[in-house]
Design a protein with these regions (language model features):
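Basic, flexible Lys/Arg- and Gly-enriched helix-loop patches that mediate nucleic-acid binding at interfaces
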Residues: 1-169
Length: 169
């Protein structure tokens, strides 16, 4: 079987699962015409959008998802209000949540717009980080997964990864 590697722009409101017993919209709805089974690399919560990788190579998908590889993921976040400079400093130092300290790789903020890079994949990590500091995330978009970029790929569309992109991962 030929190995397939896909970059998909997950729209807001879609579950990061290949099927849902309750019939809610999910990733599998976009790939139901494919014969091979696809595995998603990591997850984005239902309210988040952006780049998610899929493959019929289960071992690769599991490897890319494993925290030990510390793959950096970059996000664009829109907050309900401007990020205070003291909170920006706190995020750079590390913020304690109930399941441990969150350390970011990089962060830039301009008013309500925040660009954040993180290699952790804990559940709702960016939303929980911002909520711990008193902010509400209005939009969360994953723009990069390692060296793979979302670019201009429209929501709900997908493309194959190039051999160059796969090598760089």
């Amino acid at each position: 079987m030929t190995k397939t590697y896909i970059a998909f722009h997950k729209p807001n409101g879609i579950l990061s699962t290949m099927s849902d017993p309750e019939g809610r919209p999910c990733l599998g709805d976009y790939f139901s015409n494919r014969e091979e089974r696809l595995f998603h690399v990591g997850r984005l919560d239902k309210e988040s959008e952006g780049l998610i990788l899929l493959s019929n190579d289960g071992a690769w998908a599991q490897e890319m998802s494993h925290p030990s590889f510390e793959v950096v993921k970059r996000y664009r976040v829109l907050l309900d209000r401007a990020l205070d400079p003291k909170d920006l400093r706190a995020i750079k130092s590390g913020v304690a949540l109930e399941d441990g300290i969150v350390k970011v790789v990089a962060i830039k903020a301009q008013q309500r717009n925040v660009e954040i890079a993180i290699h952790e994949g804990r559940n709702h990590i960016i939303r929980r980080l911002m909520e711990a500091l008193g902010y509400r995330v209005e939009r969360l978009l994953r723009e990069e997964f390692g060296s793979i970029k979302l670019g201009e790929l429209p929501a709900g569309r997908w493309r194959h990864l190039s051999s160059t992109e796969l090598r760089k991962l």
